[in-house]
UniProtKB/Swiss-Prot annotation:
TPR repeats lie at residues 65-98, 99-132, 133-166, 167-199. Keywords: Plasmid, Repeat, Repressor, TPR repeat, Transcription, Transcription regulation. Transcriptional repressor of the sol locus (adhE/aad, ctfA, ctfB and adc) genes for butanol and acetone formation. It comes from Clostridium acetobutylicum (strain ATCC 824 / DSM 792 / JCM 1419 / IAM 19013 / LMG 5710 / NBRC 13948 / NRRL B-527 / VKM B-1787 / 2291 / W). The keyword S-adenosyl-L-methionine does not apply. This is Sol locus transcriptional repressor. Pfam families: TPR_12 (PF13424), TPR_8 (PF13181).
Length: 318
């Protein structure tokens, strides 16, 4: 067979055979990715991980990378932070780094008690996408989590000026509630709820607001709705426990607090019991025993090393 025949007949025929197979395989593997996410959202973590353990072996590089990043999110929300970070590192070896990777590292560092490292990533995201609202929204969320509410509001408002809406409304709602501006808090949370009525976090924030304004009945309704919308969201149980405590339902408080502590396995940065509602039980032996049993995890406890400079530098797909 001469070279002309190779290019004229053989290669086009091979492409016609291989390309449809590639498209079909990719299609079914993407469906499997979606199935894994659905399984996790329904509470079937083991089935989701079983599906993804097969997809990370895919011969198709893009599918493999997406499987790692999907599994990374599941590990993250399941609080297996070491496995989450390992999968994130695998994903960025297989495809160009993205802005979402920056946020994943940033949030992991914050949760694991490395705020200085987290801030570097959030600021890098602003450098990479200075004209995109999500960059400022995520930076604002960092400031919120570290209690710098004025800076949080400043950056949330910047995000709104760039077109961000629903999630920023939700974030501004809880931020204003934290500083005691309940009127503005309600204004923003109503906007968030109108736009996305099925978001559990909006119901949690509304529950917090109503508890702070002594509308305990409505606070409980929002708390129960948040759990109904997502039983995996451990924050919902902590919030409901706080509502129980506000209404002097100590059995309900301990029941939901124990569910929360069981789901989180350990306490990370930002998960505290400093709300004034805990004054009711801070000297209670049962409460002290529960908190004493709770483990705290930091980044240094993980058996993993990450070269921040290498990750933050270089090209990004933005």
């Amino acid at each position: 067979m001469n070279l002309l025949n190779l290019f004229t007949y053989v290669i086009p025929i091979a492409i016609c055979i291989i390309l449809p197979i590639f498209i079909i395989v990719t299609h079914f593997q993407i469906k499997s990715l979606n199935k894994a996410v659905t399984s996790f959202n329904k509470g079937d973590r083991s089935n989701a991980l079983e599906i993804l353990s097969k997809l990370v072996k895919s011969p198709i590089k893009n599918v493999k990378a997406n499987a790692y990043i999907t599994r990374e999110r599941i590990y993250f929300y399941s609080r297996d932070f070491e496995l989450s970070l390992r999968d994130l590192l695998q994903a960025i070896k297989l495809r160009p780094k993205t802005i979402n990777d920056v946020y994943s590292f940033a949030l992991s560092y914050h949760i694991l008690g490395e705020p200085e490292r987290a801030l570097k990533y959030f600021l890098r995201a602003v450098e990479l996408q200075p004209n995109v609202g999500i960059s400022y929204e995520n930076l604002a969320w960092f400031y919120y989590l570290t209690g710098k509410y004025d800076k949080a509001i400043e950056n949330f408002e910047k995000a709104i000026s760039m077109g961000s809406t629903n999630s920023v409304y939700r974030s501004l709602g809880i931020t204003y509630a934290k500083i005691g501006d309940y009127k503005k808090s309600e204004e923003y949370l109503k906007k968030a709820l109108d736009a996305e009525p099925e978001k559990p976090s909006t119901h949690i924030y509304f529950s917090y607001l109503k508890r702070k304004t002594n509308d305990i009945k409505l606070a409980k309704e929002y708390a129960l709705k948040a759990i109904e919308l997502n039983k995996n969201n451990f924050d919902g149980y902590k919030n409901l426990a706080e509502v129980n405590l506000a209404e002097d339902d100590y059995d309900g408080f301990y029941k939901n607090l124990e569910i929360f502590l069981e789901k989180i396995n350990f306490v990370t940065n930002g998960e505290d019991f400093n709300d004034e509602v805990y004054d009711k039980v801070k000297d209670n032996e049962k409460f002290k025993e529960l908190i004493a049993k709770t483990k705290v995890i930091k980044f240094k406890d993980l058996g993993i090393e990450i070269d921040d400079k290498k990750i933050l530098n270089g090209k990004f797909l933005v």
